[in-house]
């Protein structure tokens, strides 16, 4: 059996990892913080030595150094590749005017989505520090995207830049809305802020989806991913699919393609 690939997705909030076997199946997964203060280091002691590490990092140089130190401590000299967006890869064509400007996480997610839902037009909504939307045609052409503040960032901005509004986390906001009435309008300030920012997320998604369906004159599957996906999903009135491993799955495809280009999807 060939050695597995170690996949690392370093986002703006945390670092996720997975081990992918020869069939590109994610056989082991985990997550850890940007710093040791953000939680324990990953426990890789029981993992076999991988063939190499494939990394998407949008979190900066300090996080890159942390990942390198962890890899060197467990597997000295392990080959590693930090991916960059390309004009085309693994069946996906990058529609950005300057392809390398597209975040590596979004690029890997597009590759993962194209493989997960073959032959379908997709709108991919990912909820992190930022909310990102990607329009992906069934033929693998990424036609463009949108970037907006995420749910947490919206609430933090209101709390920080106003005198009387509270600063709420997504955990607090989710708890406040868990028992909320069906009526969307709330009767206290914390719930009004929580629901207003949540509806802003849902409204963005639904408007983008409807515009895409109208532009393409074809069905479009809405795919949700990211930490706030469950909360936003409750506010949506359109059908959607949840998929939380698009980036790691895309990294697995990129790694497999590099190891054996003949295995890459068309």
Swiss-Prot record:
Binding-site positions, ATP: 9-16, 129
SUPFAM superfamilies in alphabetical order: Actin-like ATPase domain (SSF53067)
GO-annotated cellular components: cytoplasm
NCBIfam families, per the entry: baf (TIGR00671), PRK13328.1-4 (NF009868)
Catalytic reactions of this protein: (R)-pantothenate + ATP = (R)-4'-phosphopantothenate + ADP + H(+)
Coiled coil: none
Protein family membership: Belongs to the type III pantothenate kinase family.
Needed co-factor(s): NH4(+); K(+)
Presence of the UniProt keyword Lyase in the record: no
InterPro entries reported in the protein's UniProt record: ATPase_NBD, Type_III_PanK
PANTHER family cross-referenced by the UniProt entry: TYPE III PANTOTHENATE KINASE (PTHR34265:SF1)
Annotated compartments: Cytoplasm
Subunit structure: Homodimer.
Residues bound to substrate: 96, 103-106, 189
Keywords, comma-separated and alphabetical: ATP-binding, Coenzyme A biosynthesis, Cytoplasm, Kinase, Nucleotide-binding, Potassium, Transferase
Function, as annotated: Catalyzes the phosphorylation of pantothenate (Pan), the first step in CoA biosynthesis.
Annotated active site: 105 (proton acceptor)
Keyword ATP-binding: yes
Gene behind this protein: coaX
Cofactor binding comment, as recorded: A monovalent cation. Ammonium or potassium.
GO molecular function: ATP binding; pantothenate kinase activity
Pathway the protein acts in: Cofactor biosynthesis; coenzyme A biosynthesis; CoA from (R)-pantothenate: step 1/5
EC supergroup of this enzyme: transferase
Gene Ontology biological process terms in this record: coenzyme A biosynthetic process
Enzyme Commission (EC) number: 2.7.1.33
Protein name: Type III pantothenate kinase
Pfam families: Pan_kinase (PF03309)
């Amino acid at each position: 059996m060939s050695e597995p690939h170690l996949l690392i997705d370093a986002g703006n909030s945390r670092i996720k990892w997975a081990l992918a076997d020869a069939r590109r199946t994610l056989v082991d997964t985990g997550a850890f913080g940007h710093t040791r203060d953000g939680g324990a280091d990953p426990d890789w002691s029981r993992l076999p030595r991988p063939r190499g590490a494939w990394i998407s990092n949008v979190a900066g140089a300090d996080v890159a150094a942390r990942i390198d130190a962890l890899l060197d401590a467990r597997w000295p000299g392990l080959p590693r590749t930090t991916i960059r967006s390309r004009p085309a890869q693994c069946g996906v064509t990058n529609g950005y005017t300057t392809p390398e400007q597209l975040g590596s996480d979004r690029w890997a997610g597009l590759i993962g989505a194209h493989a997960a839902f073959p032959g379908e037009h997709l709108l991919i909504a990912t909820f992190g520090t930022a909310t990102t939307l990607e329009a992906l045609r069934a033929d693998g052409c990424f036609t463009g995207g949108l970037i907006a503040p995420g749910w947490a960032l919206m609430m933090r901005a209101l709390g920080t830049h106003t005198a009387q509004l509270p600063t709420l986390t997504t955990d607090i906001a989710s708890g406040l809305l868990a028992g909320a009435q069906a009526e969307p309008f709330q009767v206290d300030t914390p719930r009004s802020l929580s629901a207003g920012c949540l509806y802003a997320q849902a409204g963005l998604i639904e408007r983008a989806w409807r515009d895409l369906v109208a532009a393409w004159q074809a069905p479009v599957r809405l795919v949700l991913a990211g930490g706030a996906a469950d909360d936003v999903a409750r506010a949506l009135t359109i059908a959607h699919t949840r998929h939380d491993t698009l980036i790691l799955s895309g990294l697995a495809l990129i790694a497999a393609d590099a190891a054996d280009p003949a295995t890459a999807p068309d």
